[in-house]
Each structure stands twice: as structure tokens, then as C-alpha cells.
Amino acid sequence: MDKLQNIRGVAFDLDGTLVDSAPGLAAAVDMALYALELPVAGEERVITWIGNGADVLMERALTWAREERATLRKTMGKPPVDEDIPAEEQVRILRKLFDRYYGEVAEEGTVLFPHVADTLGALHASGLSLGLVTNKPTPFVAPLLESLDIAKYFSVVIGGDDVQNKKPHPEPLLLVASRLGMMPEQMLFVGDSRNDIQAAKAAGCPSVGLTYGYNYGEAIALSEPDVIYDSFNDLLPALGLPHSDNQEIKND
């Protein structure tokens, strides 16, 4: 399409786009909830909370857990629990617990989606500048990229703590475009959620929406990205590079 004709660089979301991080995130969320004697949520539910950064993830987890506990107690004929700790303080405690547990399980609970490693390698070898924009807390990002052996492909990495405003605000995309030395319209942004597409539109970047990510249970088509792909390596022909159906699926 016309918007992809003058692309000089590509920036990517992380969770749900390059990596399946749900197992690790869900494990850390559940361990944090369990430590506070709250109901655990499970991976299927946690997936619907991913995408707005760790603080929002904690808020969603705590809201659900308190409501779930109240429902369970009512079902058993027990009175509601008096909350000794305000919700804001409980979120802060939950976040500290989450950070500790996620640091323990992040690497083993995260794998690359199919074709990601080889596609990134092909894009990098073609001379395109590559960047990463994630709402994930910054301290977790670099070690994770290194463990998956994809850090070498990115010239710029922007984590959730590196900007004042996370996606869907355009700030992180505008920052990575600036650091890559290009105009926003020259940088393609690839993501799996409405936050990604909204950020791209607000920044003036063309966008690709991937169908296999998390996106709160919604179809990515509802966010109206410029292009929709089912497989990560569909990016290659779109950018004038050979498409390989035999790329290595690297998830070790």
C-alpha cells in the first residue's frame, strides 16, 4: 500500500507482538494476589488485562480480585471483608510483589512468537532501522530481549518508564522516530492492540495490526490499522523483502 512505500524504519510493540509473555505475567500476578490472600486470576483472565503497563495491570487485577472475593464470601454466606488497606495502597503493595515475582519468572515465562527472530534478522539486514516501544516496566525489557537473543536488532528501545505518557499516547512513538532520525510517517509501527494502533495514528505513523496478540479479546480490525496480518513474517513482502515460510520458529 502507498503508506508503506517510503518506510525507513520499523518499530514494534513487545508483549503480544514479538513475544508471548502471558504465562510469565499471569504467574507473577497470581503469586502477588496469593501473597495478599486474594483470589488468583489465571492466565486466560490476565491476558485481557495486558497492554497498559504494570500499574494498570495491578489496578485491574486488584479490582477483579476484591470483587471476586466478595462474591465468593456472599455465596458461602459470609459477611464482606472490611478493607483495612485503601485500594491505592493495596495497588502499590501488589505492584511491589509483582515486580519481585516477575523478575523471577519473566524469562522462563516468555517465548518468541513464530517467525519473529528470523524476520527481525531479515529486516535488520535489509538496512531498515528497528525500534521497540513497550509499556512494560523498563528494568525488565533489556534482560528479556537479551535472553531471547533479539536485542541486537534494535537501535532504540523505549520502555514504560522512559516516557511520561505511555501508549496509546503518541509520545513514545514520536521519541523513537526522533532517535531513529526519521519523520513519523517514515516509521511503520507494528502492534497487536488498540493501544498500539491509537498511538500510531496519533503520532502519524502507518500501522500494522497483528491478529494473534492479546488486545483485550477484541479483533484488531476494530482499531482500523492500515494493514492487518495474521503472521509476523507477512511484514517481509510488504516491505519488499522475500517471504519465507520456512523460517525458524525460535522460542527456546
From Swiss-Prot:
GO terms assigned for molecular function: metal ion binding; phosphoglycolate phosphatase activity
Gene Ontology CC, one term: cytosol
Pathway: Organic acid metabolism; glycolate biosynthesis; glycolate from 2-phosphoglycolate: step 1/1
Keyword Membrane: no
Catalytic activity: 2-phosphoglycolate + H2O = glycolate + phosphate
Cofactor: Mg(2+); chloride
Binding residues for Mg(2+): 13, 15, 192
Pfam families assigned: HAD_2 (PF13419)
Taxonomic superkingdom: Bacteria
Magnesium is among the record's keywords: yes
Catalytic center residues: 13
InterPro entries in the cross-refs: HAD-like_hydrolase_sf (IPR050155), HAD-like_sf (IPR036412), HAD-SF_hydro_IA (IPR006439), HAD_2 (IPR041492), HAD_sf (IPR023214), PGP-like_dom2 (IPR023198), PGPase_prok (IPR037512)
Enzyme Commission number: 3.1.3.18
Keywords in alphabetical order: Carbohydrate metabolism, Chloride, Hydrolase, Magnesium, Metal-binding
Gene Ontology biological process: carbohydrate metabolic process; DNA repair; glycolate biosynthetic process
Family listed: Belongs to the HAD-like hydrolase superfamily. CbbY/CbbZ/Gph/YieH family.
Record's subunit section: Monomer.
Role played: Specifically catalyzes the dephosphorylation of 2-phosphoglycolate. Is involved in the dissimilation of the intracellular 2-phosphoglycolate formed during the DNA repair of 3'-phosphoglycolate ends, a major class of DNA lesions induced by oxidative stress.
Protein name as annotated: Phosphoglycolate phosphatase
Native source organism of the sequence: Salmonella typhimurium (strain LT2 / SGSC1412 / ATCC 700720)
Lineage: Bacteria, Pseudomonadati, Pseudomonadota, Gammaproteobacteria, Enterobacterales
